[in-house]
């Protein structure tokens, strides 16, 4: 356990901070997990921009390992129509619900305080999704170990996504490099296309890039329609 102490003054608990116009409740005296991971700011920006640029009725997003649902707030502020937030921590989900209320975006959000691997049926029936966010802990005793459990998520991605949908894969484990994700994706979801690795915020400059936070974007190919003979098939 890590204790956090103030050197001077006082901070209200919880304290509300602002990022890109969104408000989040944080507990700055609560060890390392304050309620908002600042190094994921580019991931939230990317999702907000995806939601804003999406044509039609708006993105449908699946937010796995949602924690306090910051990704969901960003997506809904960008114009997403629906976000399903799944996390096994009832406490984190409760803070996530509060974050949505702080920003007035409750209408588009749904919350499930369940173990992800025990609730695939509900998750699948609520799909398919335009974007799937996967932001697990690298190690959480009894629930998730990246080296063996990330693969269980990857192989399900093609079935969760609409044609042309995207997956945002996050990994914050210094001992695992980008190749850990890319090699498994080539094996377990070979049809999905790697698009980019998002940069980390300047405030979190990478002294060793492969030991830093890794956030990769993959795309499910568009559905190819059969050719119309009227468009000039065989002569």
Task: List PLM regions with ranges.
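A short glycine-rich, Lys/Arg-flanked "PGG" loop and its adjoining helix->strand segment in the class I
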Residues: 150-163
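S-adenosyl-L-methionine
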Residues: 89-131
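Conserved SAM-binding motif I beta-strand of class I
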Residues: 82-87
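C-terminal catalytic and target-recognition region of SAM-dependent MTase-like enzymes
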Residues: 166-235
């Amino acid at each position: 356990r890590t204790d956090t102490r103030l050197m001077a003054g006082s901070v209200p608990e919880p304290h509300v901070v602002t990022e890109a116009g969104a408000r989040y409740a944080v507990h700055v005296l609560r060890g390392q997990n304050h309620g908002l991971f600042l190094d994921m700011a580019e991931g939230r920006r990317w999702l907000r921009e995806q939601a804003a640029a999406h044509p039609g009725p708006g993105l449908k997003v699946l937010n796995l390992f949602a924690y306090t649902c910051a990704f969901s707030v960003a997506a809904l502020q960008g114009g997403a129509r629906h976000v399903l937030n799944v996390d096994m921590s009832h406490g984190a989900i409760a803070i996530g619900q509060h974050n949505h209320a702080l920003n007035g975006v409750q209408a588009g959000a749904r919350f499930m305080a369940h173990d992800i691997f025990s609730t695939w049926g509900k998750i699948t029936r609520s799909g398919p999704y335009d974007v799937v966010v996967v932001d697990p802990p690298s190690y959480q005793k009894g629930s998730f170990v990246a080296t063996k459990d990330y693969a269980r998520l990857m192989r399900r991605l093609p079935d969760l996504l609409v044609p042309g949908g995207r997956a945002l894969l996050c990994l914050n484990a210094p001992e695992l490099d980008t190749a850990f994700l890319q090699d498994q994706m080539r094996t377990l979801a070979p049809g999905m296309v790697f698009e980019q690795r998002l940069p980390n915020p300047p405030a979190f400059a990478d002294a060793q890039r492969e030991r830093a936070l890794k956030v990769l974007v993959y795309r499910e190919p568009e559905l190819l329609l059969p050719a119309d003979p009227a468009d000039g098939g065989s002569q």
